[in-house]
Amino acid sequence: MAEGETLVAKGETPVAVLPGAAPADVGMCPQRTERLLSVLRSEVARQRLPGAVAVIARHGRLALCEAVGALDPAAGTPMTPDAIFRIYSMTKPVVSVAALMLMEQGELLLSDPVARYLPEYGKQEVAHMVDGAVQLQRVRQPATVQDLLRHTAGLTYEFMGSSPVQRQYAQARISSLERSNAAFSQELSALPLMFEPSTHWEYSRATDVLGRVIEVLSGQTLGEFLHSRIFVPLGMRETGFFVPPDKHARIAEPFARDPDGGVQMRVIDVRQPVALESGGGGLTSTAMDYARFLQFMLNRGELGGVRLLGSRMVDFMTADHLEDIPVFSPASRALLSPGHGFGLGVAVRRALGMASMPGSPGSYHWGGRAGTTFFVDPAEDLFAILMLQAPNQREHYRLLFRNLVYAALDD
């Protein structure tokens, strides 16, 4: 992106403008910034990566917004900066912000039991293994709204293991997009918990439940609330739970088959509205739209004169809320690398060392199942986004991208 350009997609009215800058003007080495793109282009040439959009912003200015590779590798169409991606779990920070907005309005407390808003969660049971058999016991302490936000509610994901509870998730087709948020919540509440709430961290469908809480409190669908209260104020015109027909040609696609194992790549169909507006993983967005959201976060709740959250609330959201709460499963442990805790919707860096990737204490990040990823480093006044659709290579590219971004900082 050339100096002086702004973070506004073609055909958009400027709303949340992020001015462009030469990398050197924001403390980045031009040659090392270009090396990042060269590495991504090399991955495309090796047919390891279908295509990607990379964004780096520092000191409120956009130093990089570039597309590489193919938008749709089957069709051979080139990637464009305004490509639309399935962002999966990068939905979670957005929905977490929505819940905290309601908290700031006095609509909820984080200490409130989930059952206060969703009565079906008032009779939950926990699965215990006794002599090789599952026994169900009533929860001693019901899950709270904070448990939903920080993934300590006793819930799980069916694809993260094969425990008896996870098998019940699969048998109930809990991942189906064909039921409403209300019906999903009812179905999930009837399934046993993996552990007592507040005792462990397990990545889970908790943010899907949080989305239903938002619906009950607001009287709107989750999509309506996010659109009116977050997307419109921040100028995120390309973000939603499905892609309308006039934008289908901009949807980024993965390889038909995984370059590592040859298995067929499956991603959700985002061309039609779905019944379930998944608060944990249903949004589609562009790199530029999500950049607006991250600049809002880096600004501690404000963008372009629009304040959606108080500055202290953003600090609270991005603080570590786990402390000594242990991680429950190996699958969840893989998501929180050493030196990290978890806040209210994002992983949070606790220490400079220990982790396998660079980053300042207090930085935070998350990603999506199809490969999208972001990180925000307040100490460096920096955020970066990598948008791609390469599900099985996502961990490799997240680490590679992070390394290359920090290598380019030279002030």
Task: Describe each PLM feature range.
Residues 29, 92, 286:
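Short, conserved phosphate/pyrophosphate- and ester-handling motifs at nucleotide-, phospho-/glycolipid
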